[in-house]
């Protein structure tokens, strides 16, 4: 029996470290840990594909949590069937469950359905919160970088603060702040 491990995070900004540490503590060699940095809904999971090719009958695949393996209930059922057909057991460390035996497979299926429902509920709440925030005028995304040089160039051409703000799609108060900062800098040079 060989131990393999699988870890996945949903975005490239998240870290696999905690999952990998847990797999190593459970006895998986670093060379037998396969990882993916992609959404569970993504079908491009090279680490999982490689793991599926490497495992053989009698091997055990460890995964830190149930929701780290499959995209949804159907995917989890498909993956557990594939591993089962190969004679490979899948054990979920934190959840304390395994696909060994019929009862284990049933528990995995039920918990996968619960996890999928929870993901959908979280997505709904997130979207509702976004919609509410948009109605309140809250903007999302990175703050725009204001081009101070454009403000100063337009001002030197005789353009007024209101027109500068309109042309550059910034607040008039921002234009005044930039002009005020620039005049302070010029005064300090004297």
Curated annotation (Swiss-Prot):
SMART domains named in the record: Resolvase
Active site positions, chain numbering: 10
Cross-referenced Pfam families: HTH_7 (PF02796), Resolvase (PF00239)
Gene3D superfamilies: 6.10.250.10, Homeodomain-like, Resolvase, N-terminal catalytic domain
Domain Resolvase/invertase-type recombinase catalytic as annotated: residue spans: 2-137
PROSITE patterns referenced in this protein's UniProt entry, alphabetically: RECOMBINASES_1 (PS00397), RECOMBINASES_2 (PS00398), RECOMBINASES_3 (PS51736)
InterPro entries: Homeodomain-like_sf, Recombinase_CS, Resolv_N, Resolvase-like_N_sf, Resolvase_HTH_dom, SSR_resolvase
Disulfide bonds: none
GO MF annotations in UniProt: DNA binding; DNA strand exchange activity
Keyword terms: DNA integration, DNA recombination, DNA-binding, Plasmid
DNA-binding residue intervals: 161-180
Any single GO BP term: DNA integration
Record-stated family: Belongs to the site-specific recombinase resolvase family.
Function: Site-specific recombination protein.
Entry protein name: R46 site-specific recombinase
């Amino acid at each position: 029996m060989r131990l393999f491990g699988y870890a996945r995070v949903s975005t490239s900004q998240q870290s696999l470290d905690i999952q990998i540490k847990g797999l190593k503590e459970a006895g998986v060699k670093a060379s037998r840990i396969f990882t993916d940095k992609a959404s569970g809904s993504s079908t491009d999971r090279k680490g999982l594909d490689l793991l599926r090719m490497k495992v053989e009958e009698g091997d055990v695949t460890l995964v830190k949590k149930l929701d780290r393996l499959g995209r949804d209930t159907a995917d989890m059922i498909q993956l557990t069937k594939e591993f089962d057909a190969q004679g490979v057991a899948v054990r979920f460390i934190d959840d304390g469950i395994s696909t060994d035996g019929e009862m284990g497979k049933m528990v995995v299926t039920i918990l996968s359905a619960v996890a999928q429902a929870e993901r959908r509920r979280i997505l709904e709440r997130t979207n509702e919160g976004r919609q509410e925030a948009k109605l309140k005028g809250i903007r999302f995304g990175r703050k725009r970088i204001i081009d101070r040089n454009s403000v100063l160039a337009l001002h030197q051409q005789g353009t007024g603060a209101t027109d500068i703000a309109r042309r550059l799609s910034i607040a008039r108060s921002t234009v005044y702040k930039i002009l005020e900062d620039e005049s302070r800098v010029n005064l300090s040079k004297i």
